[in-house]
């Protein structure tokens, strides 16, 4: 894809957008509907197309495990490179932008929170945490579950959250 000259979103100056992925091909994780994005993820291409900045953190360990994200994000956030008020992390292989990033900041700020996560109906991963699943089901009346494929937060809080998750 080439940069889109007709549709370009404005990247907010106070937002860092990051994705984590493995070095090289993504073919072992691409669903058939997204074939063609094995070398450069659909998110990377989407961001280029819309003229948005994306920090791509890569790791050469295979097979890929999502737990690598914690280490990669911790290293990046501890490096001092991220100087923005807001920090957003997006999955590389199945997330695209369809609206202005400023809208996400507006939605985030409409809640009284330091981080806001996407939710899903999927219970993937909860089989490894039956106590957590029971607790979530006890407070969750809409059948929605936390999904870290898209989240935004105040950078200082996300930094602490990542460190806590690594314990």
Describe every region a protein language model picked out.
Residues 56, 98-99, 161-162:
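Intrinsically disordered, low-complexity regions enriched in proline, serine, glycine
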Residues 6-7, 137-142:
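Short, flexible, solvent-exposed loop/turn segments with mixed acidic/basic and small polar residues
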Residues 92:
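Short acidic donor-binding/metal-coordinating loop in glycosyltransferase active sites
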Residues 14-15, 113-114, 147-148:
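Short, surface-exposed beta-edge/turn micro-motifs
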Residues 1-86, 110, 156:
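N-terminal anchoring/stem segment of glycosyltransferases
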Residues 95-139:
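Conserved donor-nucleotide/metal-binding helix-loop-beta segment in metal-dependent transferases, i.e.
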Residues 143-167:
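Catalytic core and acceptor-binding pocket of nucleotide-sugar-dependent glycosyltransferases
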């Amino acid at each position: 894809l080439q940069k889109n000259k007709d549709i370009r979103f404005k990247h907010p100056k106070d937002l860092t957008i990051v994705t984590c992925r493995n070095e090289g091909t993504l073919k072992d994780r691409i669903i058939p509907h997204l074939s063609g994005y094995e070398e450069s993820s659909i998110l990377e291409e989407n961001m280029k197309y819309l003229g948005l900045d994306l920090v791509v953190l890569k790791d050469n360990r295979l097979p890929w495990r999502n737990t690598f994200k914690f280490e990669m994000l911790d290293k990046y956030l501890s490096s001092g490179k991220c100087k923005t008020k807001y920090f957003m992390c997006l999955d590389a292989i199945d997330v695209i932008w369809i609206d202005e990033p400023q809208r996400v900041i507006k939605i985030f700020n409409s809640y009284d929170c330091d981080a806001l996560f996407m939710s899903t109906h999927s219970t993937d991963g909860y089989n490894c945490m039956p106590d957590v699943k029971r607790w979530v089901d006890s407070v969750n009346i809409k059948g929605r579950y936390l999904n870290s494929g898209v989240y935004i937060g105040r950078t200082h809080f996300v930094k602490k959250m990542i460190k806590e998750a690594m314990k």
